[in-house]
Amino acid sequence: MSHPHPELKAAPPLPEGGMRVIALGGLGEIGRNMTVFEHAGKLLIVDCGVLFPEETQPGVDVILPDFTSIRDRLNDIVAVVLTHGHEDHIGGVPYLLRERSDIPVVGSKLTLAFLEAKLKEHGIRPRTVRVREGDRRGFGPFDCEFVAVNHSIPDSLAVAIRTRAGMVLHTGDFKMDQFPLDDRITDLRAFARLGEEGVDLFLTDSTNAEVPGFTTSERELNPAIEQVMRTAPRRVIVSSFASHVHRIQQVLDAAHQHGRKVAFVGRSMVRNMGIARDLGYLKVPSGLVVSTKELEKLPDHKITLVCTGSQGEPMAALSRMANRDHMIRIGKGDTVLLASSLIPGNENAIYRVINGLTRWGAHVVHKGNAKVHVSGHASAGELVYCYNIVKPRNVMPVHGEWRHLRANGDLAIRTGVDPDRVVIAEDGVVVDLVDGRASITGKVPAGNVYVDGMEVGGATEASLKDRLTLAAEGVVTVVAIVDADTGALAEAPDFLARGFVHDDTTFEPVIPVIEKTLATAAEEGVGDARQLEQLLARAVANWAFRTHRRKPLIIPVIIDA
């Protein structure tokens, strides 16, 4: 099993007739999935998603793949193929189309509908190509065949990419639910047929590679959801991803069965469910869905609300309800159902929301106390099954953290794949498929690109570190007026502190330290204001840590008298 070396350099030119594969996101993390395929001088991109920030990234809205390595080759991109409509696969497309707006975007009907609604908010009219399972389309030197796969969102697709270098099969996100709500199963016959033709490189979903057995069917959630609808004494508030059409269908069915009306809450939820309903993916009995205004006329035990916020997002509807910052007020007897998984890194935010809801008297039903969620990803048994029918010559696990990628690679080896042909890559690692063998040949830039409000890429790791320091340690501004002739303090320095323990006398002990620092600088001939500010910042920082065990952000200002 090959792993990326930390000292990887830039990759050499791609040999003629070969194919280059570079993941710019989705490896070593759950999110911002984006894979670039290069062949015959052209580029094909599969997915372009976002990653949601952790608590250590304050102020960040989303994290994008790094487009640096393809920015000077935008005209070589023949298409962006989208496997399905989740944010971690389509959320980055608006930012890529800002770089070149006429890139063809390829996807299924629901995927493109979700994307077009998103792009409308960005003022972008995309050039789209609608495909469905069984279709085969050419994009430059890439011959793409689309295969139905089952996932937690309708219309998901795998893609087989044929070139002169060989065939690559990318599963996208998938599982093998044999009793899916929409009766659309993963097309294992197509996988087997492609395997017989010869799959030279298999890129497959690693999310649940550590989980033994097979992923539970979505239908097994029906009893728990129905029980909530049947036994809840007052309102039922269901929180889910705004794109989880299957789960929301189950909620609608259960609400209808028990005589409840349903209202959607949250802009993305209202938008996406409207799209799914219009396209026929969400079946809504007449009169079931009403506006929140109409709910005011109904008794509480006849009300169900479906909202966003299952991951504790601070601006989502459920979080605002928990904080009493929403028109819908949670009260005693309400039941809140968190009908989604807990994404790693969001635990603290979710538990804060649960505690807030509980504080106001709600009963919270979640994965920890009821069977209200199943994964949308294949477990180890399903992955082994796929390896055995696809029989790939080379394997590159995708979509997962390091432990998931490694576990998936181990499964491939157990099914007979040569360990030397299992490539464990990470974001930015270059994998070349040449003469039927996949190998790591180099690396390209693949850092985090932060979206902060309207600004893309302005926030850096250094600025995020400053934000964390501000939050944890506070900030101290020191203004020192210095005699231009002597270099000594002309008067006592001014201090302005925020988030740092202090009173009127807090900074008196540091004044002699500042005086000594400036005197030493004068003796050594240091007169440049920037250098003096650095010395001043260091002196105050050392004093703050020595006396208060704190590391505030120090902002020094030197003014010549």
Please provide the spans of the model-predicted regions.
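A glycine- and charged-residue-rich anion-binding loop/surface
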Residues: L27, L51-E55, G59, D76-I77, ...
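Short Gly/Ser/Thr- and Asp/Glu-enriched loop/turn motifs at secondary-structure junctions
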Residues: R132, E426, R550-I554
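Conserved hydrophobic residues forming the short capping helix/wall of the S-adenosyl-L-methionine
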Residues: L119, A412, A544
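Hard-cation-handling environments
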Residues: E210-V526, E533-Q534, R538
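His/Asp/Glu-rich metal-coordinating catalytic cores
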Residues: S2-V81, H86-L298, A316-R329, N348-R352
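Broad gene-expression machinery/nucleic-acid interaction feature
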Residues: P141, S156-A158, K302, E473-T477, ...
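C-terminal tails and terminal domains of large nucleic-acid-associated
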Residues: G525-A561
